[in-house]
From Swiss-Prot:
InterPro entries: Cyclotide, Cyclotide_bracelet_CS, Cyclotide_sf. One of its GO terms (biological process) is defense response. Disulfide bonds join 5-21, 9-23, 14-28. It holds the Pfam family Cyclotide. The presence of a 'disulfide through disulfide knot' structurally defines this protein as a knottin. Probably participates in a plant defense mechanism. Signal peptide: none annotated. This is a cyclic peptide. Keywords: Disulfide bond, Plant defense. Belongs to the cyclotide family. Bracelet subfamily. It comes from Viola pubescens. This is Cyclotide vpub-C. The keyword Secreted does not apply.
Length: 31
């Protein structure tokens, strides 16, 4: 949850979750 994935998750889930990103504070982060 440190590196921003350049995607927001306000309205839709993180598409970048397929590469290990997760939603945190309306922004997708990679752990």
């Amino acid at each position: 949850g440190i590196i921003p994935c350049g995607e927001s998750c306000v309205f839709i889930p993180c598409i970048t979750s397929i590469v290990g990103c997760s939603c945190k504070s309306k922004v997708c982060y990679k752990n």
